[in-house]
């Protein structure tokens, strides 16, 4: 009796650059799971139709990337707690006529910081730069780690305040604008898009110290401008490649109930950058 290979994909626009198929192919081989994983380019005005067609063709799950995470959130028939907190979905699972929406970005970030970088979040001071979708997706998993302080800083103070109020009451959660930051933090996370424009958020170098881990959600072959700035002021730096691999591993677990090992996949991707 032959078994059907389960079908997954990453959906977005653009999508050709996505490393997700490579990551999931390695996870599948490692865990001996019978699946295929493709890239799916959806028209900017055709996300819903693309997902429906994927389901009709017996697709089992999707990773969702830019610019469709909010549409996926609205479309899901059931949401995980972390997806609800994020207000966005990066993982869809189709099962028994239901569409489960999840968000694995935050747990990917936390796993990379705590397990891979070996830096505890518990009891630490954490600065989160940015108040957009990338920041919103990681706040709940960071709070679950019980930091001493989690400060959301943004160019527009009111936007940081609006974001913090979604998680209120949280006595450890604070807001700031970039210019008001004057203390050193244990962990500084760049969730802005500044690195895409080869810029650095306008923050004081005093947020960095020798003990600081400066983490940029972006990644590339060379350190980002944020990482360069942080390193010049004494911080240890790390980019977001590990977050990419760890959020993929969490999606794989949501779909298959099997947790893959990530270290070898991370090393392979790093070597190819």
Curated annotation (Swiss-Prot):
Swiss-Prot/TrEMBL keywords: Amino-acid biosynthesis, Aromatic amino acid biosynthesis, NADP, Oxidoreductase
Q: Where are the transmembrane segments?
A: none
Active site: residue positions: 69 (proton acceptor)
Q: Which Pfam families match?
A: SDH_C (PF18317), Shikimate_DH (PF01488), Shikimate_dh_N (PF08501)
Pathway info: Metabolic intermediate biosynthesis; chorismate biosynthesis; chorismate from D-erythrose 4-phosphate and phosphoenolpyruvate: step 4/7
Asked whether the keyword Oxidoreductase is assigned, the reply is: yes
Instruction: Write out the residues that bind NADP(+).
Output: 81, 130-134, 154-159, 217, 240
What's the protein name? Shikimate dehydrogenase (NADP(+))
Source organism of this protein record: Janthinobacterium sp. (strain Marseille) (Minibacterium massiliensis)
Organism taxonomic ancestry = Bacteria, Pseudomonadati, Pseudomonadota, Betaproteobacteria, Burkholderiales
Q: Which gene encodes it?
A: aroE
């Amino acid at each position: 009796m032959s078994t059907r290979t389960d079908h997954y994909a990453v959906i977005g626009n653009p999508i050709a650059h996505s490393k997700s198929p490579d990551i999931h192919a390695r996870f599948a081989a490692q865990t001996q799971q019978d699946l295929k994983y493709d890239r799916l380019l959806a028209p900017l005005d055709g996300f819903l139709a693309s997902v429906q067609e994927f389901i009709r063709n017996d697709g089992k799950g999707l990773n969702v990337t830019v610019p469709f995470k909010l549409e996926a959130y609205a479309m899901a028939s059931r949401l995980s707690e972390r997806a609800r907190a994020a207000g966005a979905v990066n993982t869809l699972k189709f099962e028994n006529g239901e569409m489960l929406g999840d968000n694995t970005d935050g747990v990917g970030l936390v796993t990379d910081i705590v397990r891979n970088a070996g830096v505890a979040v518990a009891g630490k001071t954490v600065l989160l730069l940015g108040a957009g979708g990338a920041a919103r997706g990681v706040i709940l998993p960071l709070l679950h780690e019980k930091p001493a302080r989690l400060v959301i800083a943004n160019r527009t103070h009111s936007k940081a305040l609006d974001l913090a109020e979604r998680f209120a009451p949280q006595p450890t959660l604070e807001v700031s604008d970039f210019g008001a930051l004057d203390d050193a933090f244990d962990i500084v996370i760049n969730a802005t898009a500044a690195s895409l424009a080869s810029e650095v958020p306008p923050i004081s170098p005093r947020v960095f110290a020798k003990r600081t881990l400066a983490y940029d959600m972006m990644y590339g072959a060379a350190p980002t401008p944020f990482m360069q700035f942080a390193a010049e002021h004494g911080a240890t730096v790390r980019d977001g490649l590990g977050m990419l691999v760890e959020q993929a591993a969490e999606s794989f677990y949501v779909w298959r109930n099997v947790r893959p090992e990530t270290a070898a996949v991370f090393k392979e991707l790093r070597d190819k950058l």
